[in-house]
Amino acid sequence: MRTNSFCSSGMHLPNGSYITFGGNGAVGPGGVLGSQPNPGNYSAAWDATFQDFDGTKAMRILNPCTVSEIASSQSQCAWFDDPTELSMKTGRWYSAAEALGDGSVIIIGGFANGGYINRNTPNIDPENEGGAAIPTYEYFPSKPVTPPVFQFLVQTSGLNAYALTFLMPSGNLFVQANTSTSMWHFSISISYNSSLSSSFVG
């Protein structure tokens, strides 16, 4: 892999490939920022020692191979990892990924960069957490729209990393974060929320 996949999310694709989304900025020895910082100096684009690139916008696909290919050492199993050709619209760290009924994948939420826990008190900016939270969602394959805000992530601000997501038989998404749940009609962007309790029945 060329990019830093630490804290990425991932999902299987219909053809048997596996895809991962986002990750960490480039790091050097001891976890320090890589040798080439991004603007703002909060993450790095590249590190000369580990030779890793910023992975926050990366999409990486592991192509499948057959048992006979593996046995014959002719395996074509390899990661495709080239952000100049395949990347997300928004950098994401600790996002969620869920396969949809049409074979696409929805990528939900996350943080703007690594090393951040969104537990600000008082929480005066629940949507963006001072620029550290990513309360939006997008798709693979990409759609020609700006990633919309998922209001459930705003309502669960404070603890919504790696939101638990489940595709339901109806085609809607059951989503859990913080102490809340939502049945999300994502195709029309409507959600029905509930506080999570032991008596909740999905």
What are these regions (language model features)?
Residues 1-84, 99:
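Eukaryotic helix-linker segments that join adjacent hydrophobic helices
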Residues 25-29, 41, 112-116, 180-182:
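Short glycine/acidic-enriched loop and turn motifs that connect beta-strands
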Residues 6-11, 91-98, 135, 161-165, ...:
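Beta-propeller and closely related beta-sheet repeat lectin domains
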Residues 1-5, 84-92, 153-159, 199-202:
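Short loop/turn motifs that recur once per blade in beta-propeller domains
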Residues 16-21, 25-27, 103-109, 170-175:
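Entry beta-strands of beta-propeller and related beta-repeat scaffolds
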Residues 70-86, 147-154, 194-201:
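Beta-propeller fold detector
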Residues 154-202:
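Beta-propeller domains
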Residues 34-73, 120-145, 181-193:
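Beta-propeller blade signature
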